[in-house]
């Protein structure tokens, strides 16, 4: 049980780092347009100050509160950590990543960022330690409606896209691609991550059982 928990937390933190790095890459490739949620956070940053990461935390806290009220359950510790750490990691990567000077570089970096976002979400959600604010809402809607997770994700992304556009956020062709492709990638990354985690847990459990007892 202890070994399984360690593996789950490893997947969780690895997923958060992958996700945050992907977000920062899409921001660096903003010549194409920023991903919907980050365009929304970026527009808030433009209007009211603070940082993109700080607005990610604030909006996440509001969503966690709404989801908790709807389900009448306290959020998992993983959801709370996600709410804070994603914002911190985004600001960290935004600080250390060099600015791009070419359009070709923006395309490459943005494309890689979209893939990492989709897989980052799949990896940390597979740990079962509490999805982040936005993904908790996604899973709640999926559970209550029975709709495909890809379409739920796309619907949320498109809704936020229009909100960001209305606030003058950096919307472009890349924003539309992110809204569509993230849900598609998640459809594959989530079951793949669950399968990989279960395999790692089974291997670790078998290794522990096979090891000689300590006297």
Swiss-Prot record:
It is a multi-pass membrane protein. The keyword Ribonucleoprotein does not apply. The keyword Isomerase does not apply. The chain crosses the membrane at residues 9-29, 50-70, 77-97, 107-127, 160-180. It is found in: Cell membrane. GO terms for cellular component: plasma membrane. InterPro entries: YczE/YyaS-like (IPR038750). Keywords: Cell membrane, Membrane, Transmembrane, Transmembrane helix. This is Uncharacterized membrane protein YczE. It comes from Bacillus subtilis (strain 168). The lineage of its organism: Bacteria, Bacillati, Bacillota, Bacilli, Bacillales. The gene is yczE.
């Amino acid at each position: 049980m202890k070994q399984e928990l360690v593996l789950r937390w490893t997947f969780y933190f690895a997923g958060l780092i992958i996700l945050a790095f992907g977000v920062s890459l899409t921001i660096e490739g903003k010549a194409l347009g920023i991903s919907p949620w980050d365009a929304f956070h970026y527009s808030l940053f433009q209007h009211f100050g603070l940082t993109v990461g700080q607005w990610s935390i604030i909006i996440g806290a509001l969503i966690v509160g709404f989801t908790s009220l709807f389900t009448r359950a306290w959020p998992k510790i993983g959801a709370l950590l996600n709410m804070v750490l994603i914002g911190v990691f985004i600001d960290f990567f935004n600080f250390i990543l060099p600015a791009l000077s070419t359009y070709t570089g923006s395309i490459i970096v943005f494309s890689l960022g979209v893939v990492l976002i989709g897989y980052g979400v799949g990896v940390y959600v597979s740990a079962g330690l509490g999805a982040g604010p936005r993904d908790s809402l996604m899973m709640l809607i999926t559970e209550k409606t029975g709709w495909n997770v890809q379409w739920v994700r796309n619907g949320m992304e498109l809704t936020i896209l229009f909100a960001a556009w209305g606030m003058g956020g950096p919307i472009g062709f890349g924003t539309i691609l992110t809204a569509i492709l993230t849900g598609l990638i998640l459809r594959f990354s989530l079951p793949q991550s669950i399968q990989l985690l279960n395999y790692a847990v089974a291997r670790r459990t078998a290794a522990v059982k096979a090891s000689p007892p300590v006297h």
